[in-house]
Amino acid sequence: LHCPQCALGLTLHQPGNRGICHGCGLVTAVPESCPSCGVQEIVHRGTGTQRLEDQVRSQFRGIRVARMDTDTMRTRGSHEKTLTAFRKHEIDLLVGTQMIAKGLDFPNVMLVGVINADAALHLADFRASERTCQLVTQVAGRSGRGPRGGRVVVQTSTPEHPAMRAAAVHDYEAFVQSELPIRESLLYPPFGSVVRIVVRGAVNDAAADWAKYLVQRLTKSVQGNDTIRILGPAPAPISRIRDRYRWHLQVHGPDPGTL
C-alpha cells in the first residue's frame, strides 16, 4: 500500500490497524482486501519495533517485554517510567529504536541484540557509514557494564563492511582510517564542503527542467574552476512528498566560502 501523496509505502501501526505515511503524516485505515486484485488474505510483514516485539513475545513466552519508540513514548513521563521499570527489573527485555542507544547505563544488562544493523548503511547520505558505526558501537556499549560482563549480537547482511568490522571490535579509529580516503577523493567533509539543492514542483517534468537549468547555470558560473564539482540533477531519494515532485543536485567545493 502506497501513500497517494508521496513516493512512500504506508507503515502498519497496531493497535488500530492504521497505515501511516512517514513522509506527510497521512493516516488511513488498512483495507481488508487488496485494492489492486481484491484478494482478502493480506499478510502483514515488517521489520519495525512493533513486529519485533510481537516476535519476541511469541518466542519467549512469560518474559516481561516493553517497547520504546515514538508510538509508545507519546505521553508525558512515559520515557522515564519505562526506564525506571527496566532498571528495577520489572521489565526483562526492552525493544526499542535508537532512543535506547544513547546515554543509558544499566549494569545488569548482559545481552544486547542489534537487529538489521545495516538498515541505514546504504542511504543516500555520505555520513551513512559513519552514523551506522557510531550507532552500533553505542548500542553495543549498553551490554556488559556490570562485573558479570555481557554479550552483543549484531544482525547484518554486510559483516565485512568497514563500519561493521570496526564497530564489532570497538575500533572507531580503524573506521576513520578507511573512510577518510573516500571522503577526500569526493571532496566530502572534512576535506571539502557540500551544498545540496532540492527543487520541488507540482509537475515532475517542470521540476526536472528547473533542476537541469540550475546545473547549466552553475556549470557556466564555475567554468575554469577545477576545485568545484557539480553532481546531478537526479530524482531525490524520496521523489515525491505531499504531491510535490523532488529533484536534487549537489555542489562540492573546498570550503563554504567558495561555494
Please identify what each model-predicted range represents:
Residues L1-Q216, K220-S221, A236-S239, W247-Q250, ...:
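Inter-lobe coupling/hinge segments of SF2-like helicase ATPases
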Residues T227, T258-L259:
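Hydrophobic multi-pass inner-membrane translocation pores used for secretion
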Residues N225-P237:
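Conserved small-domain helix->loop->beta segment predominantly found in fold-type I
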